[in-house]
From Swiss-Prot:
Keyword field: Hydrolase
Pfam families: Lactamase_B_2 (PF12706)
Molecular functions (GO terms): hydrolase activity
Origin species: Nitratidesulfovibrio vulgaris (strain ATCC 29579 / DSM 644 / CCUG 34227 / NCIMB 8303 / VKM B-1760 / Hildenborough) (Desulfovibrio vulgaris)
Leader sequence segment: none
Family as reported in the entry's similarity comment: Belongs to the UPF0173 family.
Name of the protein described by the UniProt record: UPF0173 metal-dependent hydrolase DVU_3308
Superkingdom of origin: Bacteria
Amino acid sequence: MQTRITWHGHSNFQVASGGTNVLIDPFFDGNPVAAARWDAIDRPDLVLVTHDHGDHVGQAIDICKATGAKLGCVVGTDARLVEAGLPRELVLNGIGFNIGGTVECAGARITMTQAYHSSESGVPVGYIVTMPDGFTFYHAGDTGIFSEMELWGRLYAIDLALLPIGGVFTMDPRQAALACSLLRARSVIPMHWGTFPVLEQNTTRFREQLANHAPDCRLFNMTPGESLTLDRSQEGCAC
């Protein structure tokens, strides 16, 4: 089975595998590096929002209303999104879910993790998603490094980690590289860099730090708008 990952820039990813399409942090309008419009992407079955900041909520409400996709978020952020126009029936689990909880949607299993950041509502979170074919990825959201990443790496065989490296508001390259080791991630795609001048502008330092802290973790360098296809039998994924 193959998994297709598309990076729309910043923390905005689509992951399609086993017939299910998951979109995370759909920041299109106002995203200076987004290569597509929100209404021109492949239809998602599920939209996940990591926290209530404009560059992560993005066009989640518009996309869900246009496609009927469910929206997954932490309890507390659901009310803010419904107030902003999201139909309540499109909220995954009716009211959202919470850290440590697992829900199912479109054949995928989604577990919510903690994140260390800020949010206008609810709390910031990350997600570990196991697709219908077993491919498992972790989207960290905006976060600093935290020691409990090691526990998530013991609980789940993470085929792919999507980690912020931009610094200032999140982990920097050194912290993100050590996070790969804690998570025991088989591969990593860096995110939350290059979007704005205040962030890390390339992945050079991350590549160097990864060689020091997690040399067995495979780095996939992507550019906004690029898609990557992983074959689990060739990549050595656990699933």
